[in-house]
Amino acid sequence: MSQGTVLVTGATGDTGGATVEQLLARGRRVRALAHRKDARSKRLQELGAEVVFGDFLDLDAIRAAVQGVQRAYFCYPIRPGIIQATAYFAQAAKEAGVDGIVNMS
């Protein structure tokens, strides 16, 4: 199987950020989904990740983030909106033909 792009959500958090670092260290192409531009998202860009911005509760933003990725690492905090965010992510990933998803729980 080819080494396609991996989308990491929650990429500016502790778990997502560590995941981005490990994937990049293994030579994978990484698209990091962040909520906003800040020092943490800038650092991910400097490490070599493609950083995109969006809100989990915006289906169109999630659709754009998953376009062209092979696999995804879904990391969403336990807080209000998790059910809707998970549903949007699953829908967008299915529509985009994402091969596999790891769900951090």
Predicted feature descriptions by range:
Residues 2-28:
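N-terminal Rossmann NAD(P)H-binding glycine-rich loop of SDR-like oxidoreductase domains
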Residues 28-36, 74:
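Conserved glycine-rich Rossmann-like NAD(P)H-binding loop of the short-chain dehydrogenase/reductase
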Residues 33-38, 54-57:
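N-terminal Rossmann-fold cofactor-binding loop
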Residues 40-50:
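Short, conserved SAM-binding/catalytic segment
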